[in-house]
Swiss-Prot record:
Annotated region (Flexible linker), positions in chain: 143
Physiological role: The RuvA-RuvB-RuvC complex processes Holliday junction (HJ) DNA during genetic recombination and DNA repair, while the RuvA-RuvB complex plays an important role in the rescue of blocked DNA replication forks via replication fork reversal (RFR). RuvA specifically binds to HJ cruciform DNA, conferring on it an open structure. The RuvB hexamer acts as an ATP-dependent pump, pulling dsDNA into and through the RuvAB complex. HJ branch migration allows RuvC to scan DNA until it finds its consensus sequence, where it cleaves and resolves the cruciform DNA.
Region (Domain I): 1-64
HAMAP family (UniProt xref): DNA_HJ_migration_RuvA
Organism, scientific name: Ehrlichia chaffeensis (strain ATCC CRL-10679 / Arkansas)
Pfam families in alphabetical order: HHH_5, RuvA_C, RuvA_N
Name of the gene: ruvA
Comment, domains: Has three domains with a flexible linker between the domains II and III and assumes an 'L' shape. Domain III is highly mobile and contacts RuvB.
Keywords annotated in UniProt: Cytoplasm, DNA damage, DNA recombination, DNA repair, DNA-binding
InterPro entries xref list: DNA_helicase_Holl-junc_RuvA_I, NA-bd_OB-fold, RuvA, RuvA_2-like, RuvA_C, RuvA_C_sf
Residues covered by region (Domain II): 65-142
Assembly mode: Homotetramer. Forms an RuvA(8)-RuvB(12)-Holliday junction (HJ) complex. HJ DNA is sandwiched between 2 RuvA tetramers; dsDNA enters through RuvA and exits via RuvB. An RuvB hexamer assembles on each DNA strand where it exits the tetramer. Each RuvB hexamer is contacted by two RuvA subunits (via domain III) on 2 adjacent RuvB subunits; this complex drives branch migration. In the full resolvosome a probable DNA-RuvA(4)-RuvB(12)-RuvC(2) complex forms which resolves the HJ.
Protein name as annotated: Holliday junction branch migration complex subunit RuvA
GO biological process: DNA recombination; DNA repair
GO CC terms in record: cytoplasm; Holliday junction helicase complex; Holliday junction resolvase complex
Amino acid sequence: MIGSLTGIIEEIYNNYIILNVGNVGYIIYVSHKVLQSCKTGNNIKLYIETYVNRDNLTQLYGFLDKQEQDYMRMLVTINGINHKTAISILSKLSPEQIFSAVVSNNKNAFRGNGIGEKLAGRITTELQYKISKMPIEETLIIKEDDSLAALISLGYDKLKAFNAIQEIKANFPDDSIQEIIRKALQKLSQ
C-alpha cells in the first residue's frame, strides 16, 4: 500500500495526472479540485488511496488532504458507489458540501454523473450514520468555529446542532460565536 507520494507533475489530463516520483511516472486519478491546483512542473504531495479493480489492475487515487481521502473511503463503502463514482462526487462537492448535503438530507446534491434518485437517497441515508460516528474534527463542519463543539459538549446531537447553527448563520451572518451558541440553545430547547 502507498500512503502518499511526493513528486513533480509531468502531465495533466481530464481526470488524472502523471506524477514523477524518483523517475517513475505514476498515473493518479484526482478530483477536479486537485486538478485545478496542478501545474506541470510543480512539486506536489498527494495522499494515496490504492484500488485493485476487477481486471486486477491497480489504480491510484490522489488527494490534497486527509479529509477528502476519508470521504472517498466512506463513499466507496456504499453499495453502488465505486472509486470512479466517488471521485466524480468529490469533483462536484467538497467534503464540507457533502456533509452539509447529508445533514440537510439534500439528495439532489448527489444526483448526476450516473447517480439517480435511488442511489442519491442511499448515499444520504448511509452517510448520515457514518458521519454521526466520526470524531468532530473529521466532520469538517466549522474549523474556525467552536459553536458546534460547545453544543455537542452540552449533550446535543451533532446533526441537530449543526442544522441549528447553519440556520442561525444563514439568518444572522455577522453574529459572534457567543450569539450563535445562545440562539442555537434557544432553538434546540424548543
